[in-house]
Structure formats: C-alpha cells, structure tokens
Amino acid sequence: MIQLLALKRDLKVEIREKFSIIEKRIGDKDVLLKEVCNEVVILSTCNRIEIYFNSEKNRKQIIEEIFSKMGWNINFLENFFYCKGDEAINHLMEVACGFDSLILGEDQILGQIKAAYDTALKNKTSGSELKKLFQLVITCGKEFRSISMLNRIPVSSASIAVNKARQENLRRFMVFGFGDVGSLVCKYILSSDFDVLYIVVRNKAAVSIKDKRIKVLSFNEKNSYYDDVECMISCTSAPHPVIWEKELPYRKFTIFDLAVPRDVEETVYGRNNIDIYDIDQISMIDNNNRKKRKEIMMANRHIMSKYIVEFYDWQKVQEIVPDIIKLKLYGESVNKRRYETFKNKKATKDNDMLVNMLIKSTSNVYINRAIEVLKEEQLKGRGEDCLRILRRIFQK
C-alpha cells in the first residue's frame, strides 16, 4: 500500500532544517530507504520533506526503519505525520496543484515533484505503483495550471522576495546561488529596473547572462562587495551558512533567506540594522493575488478528481494482470502448436487448405471453450451474465 511519512506543515524553519536533505544526497537516501521499502520517492524542498513509499510492514516497524536509515532521532517523530492509501494519494495531488504550499499556488512545486520522481527513476527505487501515481500527478499538475491559467499570476518565494525589495525601493542586489531558485530570483530582478546585481556562485562559468549591470563573483570575492549592496537574496543548497555576521559591515541591509537549511548565520537575526526574512516569514508576506488565486484554484479542483479516479482504475486492473499474462501465454502456446504443424506439413499439403484448417482450428480453440463455459454457467443459473460478457468479446 502507498504510504506517506512527512514533516508537518506548521513547523518553524529552525526545526525543518534539522531534517533537510542536500539535493545531491536525495538519490543516496532513496537507495537506502529502498532497502526497507518495496519502492520509495523522496520529495525534499525548502518547505517540505515527504517520503512516499510502498510496504507491507506494520506502521511502527516501517517508520522506525525509515528513521534509522535517514539518521533521524525517533524522539522527533512528533514533528511528522503519517497517512496511507487514499489520504496519501490525495495529498500528493494537492501538493502538485499548489493547494498544500505555504505560498498558495506557487509555481515551483511541480518541477520539484518531477525532479524527485526522476531521481527515483534514475536510482531504480520506484516500482509500478509509484511510477504510475507520479506520472498521473505530474500530468494532473500540468493540466491544472494550464486550465486555471495560474501562469498569469505567478507566485513563488523568489517573486515575493523581489517584489518586497521593489516596494522598499532597493536597487542594488546580491544573489547567492544560481540553481532553480537563484536563477528565478535573477529573472525577476532583470524584469524590472535596477542598478547592480552581483551573483555569487561556486562556478562562475555557470552564469552566462550578458548585462553590464551584472557581475558574477566567487564566494571568496563576495565580502569585498558588501558595501555596494542594499539587498541580499540567498538560495544555495549549502548545508551551512554562507552569510556570516563577522563578515558583514555594520550598516543597513535587507536580507531574504530562501534556503533550508538557512544560508544566514543565526546571530545575524539579532542585528537591529538588518531586516531579515527567512522562508517562513516570506511565505507570510501579504500578497494581493492570494485571494484571487484561491478562487481560481477551488473552481478547478475537480481536475484532481479525474486523475485520482484514473489511478484507482489502474490499480483495479493490476489485480488481474497475472491472469492477463496467463491468457497471453496460452494464446502464444496455441499459436506455436499450429505454426509447428504448418512447418511440418507445408511441403506435403496444399498450403491454402492447410492454412485455412489451422486458422479454423485456432478460432475453434476459443469458440468451443466459450461454448463449454456458457453451458456450465447456464446450468448454475449464471448463463445470462456469462452470455453478456461473451457477446462483448465475440460480437461487435
């Protein structure tokens, strides 16, 4: 059965970051959990850790094994919620469509779900059920966004941070990291007027934006440019801070920390001349489009139901897959016997007559058996039901 073990939504970032997984380690964790689960996909973002898995083990045992493999202290279990079956499937659908995001309808989660699925595929940790579920979830998320046209009012932590900086008339930026979030931050900054943008990365060659207002820096160079900056937006995947209090000049800054674990040293939060927002505070910033997005999303919620039903229908069909395989194997054996007969007799018989005889013999195998079953079912009082099925099979 498909199950879910996930961090609760209302946890503070200080707690969430204790369980964060570095992006490049997610595949390794998938493989570790596959040792105790039949199949597994880990969805890890700045706002969530969700482990989707399939297992026949009892709840207590599998949760303890997952915690052990992840290196988590079981005493922190109270920070997690668990569900299975319908509830787990519905939850993933809601996540994909943006209903479960701290920033309602945010447009990054679908890409993150696809990345989680691709990682599981690459590491061979997803089996048939999770493969089918994630394929339908991704398709559902795309259709939901297309029909609801949420792209007309896009929202993400990146857009909220940049818009907030605009409202405060900040024009001199420094962005840390140029991954999915960092590149999105830069895109939003570039979409409007600004004075200067410093992009701090480990590999300077990764940034190819051509704009005289942009300067690409290494992490070793960043400190020399702090005095020229009004706003910092940090979104690296580093497991440790990249903005340290001892390195910051004693002057006013506005800092948006979009990372989990946080990129900004905790003592910086105590500086009274620095306005700093972590990912939770960014999610709470008033957004004029929130009510409108919610109305649009609720009006299109039925799209999820269609894909949930499709998944349940697929599950039902899987119950008879072994019988379908047996039917196909039986058909192959019937074909093989008649082909062998043809090979052995084609030199001594009229081929047209031989082929006609073998084709008729092949059809008789199924027709005669169907007649036998129909007679048996008629005697048992189930003839009408059997006949209705046989008509669907043999009559158009």
Swiss-Prot record:
The keyword Metal-binding does not apply. SUPFAM superfamilies: Glutamyl tRNA-reductase catalytic, N-terminal domain, NAD(P)-binding Rossmann-fold domains. The keyword Kinase does not apply. NADP(+) binds at residues 177-182. It is an enzyme of class 1 (oxidoreductase). The active site is at residue 46. GO terms for biological process: protoporphyrinogen IX biosynthetic process from glutamate. Substrate binds at residues 45-48, 101, 106-108, 112. It catalyses: (S)-4-amino-5-oxopentanoate + tRNA(Glu) + NADP(+) = L-glutamyl-tRNA(Glu) + NADPH + H(+). The record marks 91 as: Important for activity. Keywords: NADP, Oxidoreductase, Porphyrin biosynthesis. Its EC number is 1.2.1.70. One of its GO terms (molecular function) is glutamyl-tRNA reductase activity. Pathway: Porphyrin-containing compound metabolism; protoporphyrin-IX biosynthesis; 5-aminolevulinate from L-glutamyl-tRNA(Glu): step 1/2. Pfam families: GlutR_dimer (PF00745), GlutR_N (PF05201), Shikimate_DH (PF01488). Catalyzes the NADPH-dependent reduction of glutamyl-tRNA(Glu) to glutamate 1-semialdehyde (GSA). NCBIfam families: hemA. During catalysis, the active site Cys acts as a nucleophile attacking the alpha-carbonyl group of tRNA-bound glutamate with the formation of a thioester intermediate between enzyme and glutamate, and the concomitant release of tRNA(Glu). The thioester intermediate is finally reduced by direct hydride transfer from NADPH, to form the product GSA. Possesses an unusual extended V-shaped dimeric structure with each monomer consisting of three distinct domains arranged along a curved 'spinal' alpha-helix. The N-terminal catalytic domain specifically recognizes the glutamate moiety of the substrate. The second domain is the NADPH-binding domain, and the third C-terminal domain is responsible for dimerization. Homodimer. PANTHER family: GLUTAMYL-TRNA REDUCTASE. Belongs to the glutamyl-tRNA reductase family. This is Glutamyl-tRNA reductase. It comes from Clostridium acetobutylicum (strain ATCC 824 / DSM 792 / JCM 1419 / IAM 19013 / LMG 5710 / NBRC 13948 / NRRL B-527 / VKM B-1787 / 2291 / W).
